[in-house]
């Protein structure tokens, strides 16, 4: 299981399938991003929304469509928030039903470069960028670097507290030792 660090439901499904078929289960964890002193760290989408509700300025949300509902309780969210999500028809429709439409709904497939993240922050005059700590594979550092370059505050939603598994290096060693690879 090398899924996204926030894909808890997928991980449960994989683990259950392995248990049901008596197949060994191994999880490979993405390395967390580097700590950034100028960022605001929060434990959940709700805490991020509460924090942002006390601020002024536009916000680029890069957390994905499944998290958007947690931001709809914010004052003036339809004018302040710019949501970047996958450009799938069902995703765009679900976002529109939450009130994210027009220029406030950006449909694209990532990960994105620092330059493209910075261009979006400038285009929408965003003072904040909200992201999950997706690690290098999720373009995390490029988002943080772009935010800092644009004088936007990165708001980072921490990973689930209980992550079990092994690093990529540990996984390679394990596979070599146990499967003669």
What do these predicted regions represent?
Residues 1-48:
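Glycine/small-residue-rich loop that forms an oxyanion/phosphate-binding "nest" at active or ligand-binding sites
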Residues 94-104, 108-119, 123-124, 128-150, ...:
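A C-terminal functional module that forms or caps the active site or interfaces directly
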Residues 19-24, 79, 149-153:
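A short helix->loop->beta-strand "cap" motif at the edges of active sites that frequently abuts
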Residues 39-54, 63-67, 112-114:
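Active-site glycine-rich loop that binds ribose-phosphate moieties when present
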Residues 88-91, 153-165:
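Short, flexible loop segments at boundaries between secondary-structure elements
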Residues 26-46, 95, 161-181:
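Intrinsically disordered or low-complexity boundary/linker segments at protein termini
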Residues 27-28, 84, 156-158:
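Generic beta-sheet signal
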Residues 57, 64-105:
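Anionic-ligand binding region
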